[in-house]
Curated annotation (Swiss-Prot):
Cofactor(s), by name: Zn(2+)
A GO biological process held by the record: response to stress
Biological source species: Bacillus cereus (strain ATCC 10987 / NRS 248)
Protein name: Protein SprT-like
GO MF terms held by the record: zinc ion binding
HAMAP family: SprT_like
Major place of residence: cytoplasm
Metal-binding found in the keyword field: yes
Annotated Gene Ontology cellular component terms: cytoplasm
Top-level taxon of origin: Bacteria
């Protein structure tokens, strides 16, 4: 799906579900990571995440488009366009748009785990962040800490 196809899709969804035309640009933004799409208040454009289309298909993309068009049409008409606004929630229900998009699969970062051991009492510490072993000591016996395992 290219830029012209997504523009046409957004215009069709706008007329079909909202009965109002979409007069601005709809485009894919490759820099979007965790969100399905976003409505830009200053330009009135809609940016969509292409990876959601690749992963979940056109149905999920149409749901994201409907969600962003709710923001668009409410903002254009001067009504409450934010997620917490009553107008927004009512319009979402009326057009059967999702409040949130699905989570991206395989997007979880592998969590690094650092394991430290006290040289004095052999107490082990598991941390997600690396610590400076020259500055910190064991809380139990004040012994020196050494890094024994780094898992990524």
């Amino acid at each position: 799906m290219d830029e012209q196809e997504i523009q046409r899709l957004v215009e069709e969804v706008s007329l079909q579900y909202f009965g109002m035309p979409f007069l601005h640009k709809a485009l894919f933004n490759s820099r979007l990571r965790t969100t399905g799409g976003r409505y830009l208040l200053n330009t009135h454009n809609i940016e969509l995440n292409y990876r959601y289309y690749e992963m979940y298909g056109k149905e999920e993309l149409v749901g994201i488009v409907k969600h962003e068009l709710c923001h668009y049409h409410l903002h254009i008409t001067g009504r409450g366009y934010k997620h917490r606004d009553k107008d927004f929630r009512e319009l979402l229900k009326a057009v059967d748009a999702p409040r949130f998009c699905k989570r991206m699969m395989n997007e979880e970062k592998e969590k690094k785990v650092y394991m430290y051991e006290c040289m004095g009492c052999s107490l082990q510490y598991v941390r997600r962040r690396q610590i400076n072993t020259k500055r910190y000591v064991c809380g139990k016996c004040k012994g020196k800490l050494i890094l024994i395992k780094k898992t990524s």
